[in-house]
């Protein structure tokens, strides 16, 4: 007997819904002062929906403190998601700071430096 697998499209839809719901729940329900203005950038689900990597950026506070506070609130957020989502398994949440912006700025800076060096050599 074959196991029923969820489609990749369904996985994306559920991840998007979790992203939207978490954004709202963090803003309205989480009262930890270490969590300032947070943006949920993306959510990656395992195929069995058991775990979700939640990538965020923070405008206030340090990324480490914010990550610690979000992971501390993960159980509460999981329970709130369970009430909102209509799926059999609500994933365990694992929050990670999204370093994409910092890496892009650093890469851009390196490109600018390389171009400036090349211009001086010409």
From Swiss-Prot:
SUPFAM superfamilies noted in UniProt: Ribosome-binding factor A, RbfA
Cytoplasm recorded as keyword: yes
Chief localization: cytoplasm
Cell compartment(s), UniProt: Cytoplasm
Cellular component GO terms held in the UniProt record: cytosol
GO biological process: maturation of SSU-rRNA
InterPro entries reported in the protein's UniProt record: KH_dom-like_a/b, RbfA, RbfA_dom_sf
An example molecular function term from Gene Ontology annotations: ribosomal small subunit binding
Domain of life assignment: Bacteria
Keywords recorded for this protein, A-Z: Cytoplasm, Ribosome biogenesis
PANTHER family: RIBOSOME-BINDING FACTOR A, CHLOROPLASTIC-RELATED
Function: One of several proteins that assist in the late maturation steps of the functional core of the 30S ribosomal subunit. Associates with free 30S ribosomal subunits (but not with 30S subunits that are part of 70S ribosomes or polysomes). Required for efficient processing of 16S rRNA. May interact with the 5'-terminal helix region of 16S rRNA.
Assembly mode: Monomer. Binds 30S ribosomal subunits, but not 50S ribosomal subunits or 70S ribosomes.
Family per similarity comment: Belongs to the RbfA family.
Protein name: Ribosome-binding factor A
Name of the coding gene: rbfA
